[in-house]
């Protein structure tokens, strides 16, 4: 009886150790799958919205460029001070928010094999599920005197994100 109990304890310890060893791999695979699903869902919503009512991409781009121009005289804010502030600019949140889910697009880096969603803001909740755009920096539409800041975690045990950069 003691031998069975000892084998059971050893088996439980082995399974616990194996679980700890496999957790980062399994969690990373799950997050990669989830990010692909989110991006596919975003692209599908945008396609459906475009087919149903049409999306004026020129107007969306103009709105983003106007937002970027309004930032020109400003200094890039301190991201930590921004995180402590209570309000989020509604103009910012509604710009490049075509699907209405706060996702503004995705960033793909083929060399390191990542494709992750970009969300408005850099709050902890956002950075745990993808990349975040720093409010107060230029929106990522290009143009002169624009500097978009896209940030993501690196070194999370549950997701790769920007770990390989």
Residue spans for each PLM region:
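Solvent-exposed, non-transmembrane regions of membrane-associated and secreted proteins
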Residues: 3-4, 10-165
